[in-house]
Amino acid sequence: MIRLQDIADMAGVSRTTVSNVINGNTKRVSQETIDKITRILKEQNYVPHMGSVMLSGHGSRIIGVVLGFAVTHGMQALQDSFVGELVGTIQTEAERNGYFVMLIGGEKIDNVVDMASRWNVEGLIILGYDEKRYHQLSRKLNKKMVLIDAYPEGEYTFQNVGVDDYSGVYQVGEYLYSCGYRKALFVAETDRDSDARRWMGFKQAMEKNGEFCSRSRLIIVPGEKTGRLKKYEELLPRFLRARALAFSSDYDAIEAMNYFFDQGIRIPDQISIVGYDDSIFAEFVRPKLTTVHQDIHQKGVLAYRRLIKMIAGESMKELNIKSPVRLIKRDSVKE
């Protein structure tokens, strides 16, 4: 492997001059020397040592992807199809443009600060942070940041890429109501952030025609599988009376479908099911899952491109980019 000193010897300049050209410090270097060094670098296929690049104080070309949670649905976060596709999209987009992606565990804010500082990351894309955690991090770390699916208490004060969660489940509520499911239930793992917006869309769609939808129709299930299955067993008689369930994620919807199948309950003849995300598994399960489609790939691309613009110094007037969603009708709802 060719060394920096070898390049300097070929160009007839000092090692420091070569280093300055590589790192963009060319104010005191003539154009002729820059051109000569650049030509030799290309001819020799010189690849700079990443450690040197990062310590130079110039762009490391590293993007940090922060996961604010290690576990989702009771499993490792990266096992979830939504998280996996999102992170994979960001990585592909970054590598296509000459950037590197570093995955950072974000449950502890100090870990994010430490990793981002040590590796001189140029910016962060953050999944799983709320407004409070974002401000805690931004006070400790001066880096460009884009959040994904974050919700503020009031107006947005940070860059966010999300979807229209309210509209997605409003469409579900309208659809189920039109199919005659006046007592359908909404099932989620929390009553916060995106789950809260989705529940509100469901509730208001159900109430559009004067059908009161009380909070008792919001079913909160545990975040781990054993607890969820126990909850499904406990609520099975109520589920059968409701005849339709709207879930806040495809994962939970498909898990519930499998549970019902094991109990001998027919989907959709006895219980209709709707999910949210349109994950790759929505078409694998039988019956195929009716769900709300969100473009996860586009979300990852938008987050990456937005961060790169911020790193380049562009100002972003619109703080919250919200992608549209649409209901995909398949086979898990009996019309």
State each model region's role.
Residues 2, 58, 62-174, 234-241, ...:
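Alpha-helical recognition/docking segments in bacterial nutrient-uptake
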Residues 1-60:
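N-terminal helix-turn-helix DNA-binding module of bacterial transcription factors
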Residues 91-105, 183-185, 203-227:
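Short beta-strand elements in bilobed, periplasmic/extracellular small-molecule ligand-binding domains
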Residues 233-335:
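Flexible loop/turn connectors
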Residues 160-186, 226-233, 253, 294-312:
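Hydrophobic alpha-helical segments within soluble ligand-binding/sensing domains
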Residues 170-210, 319-332:
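An alpha-beta-alpha
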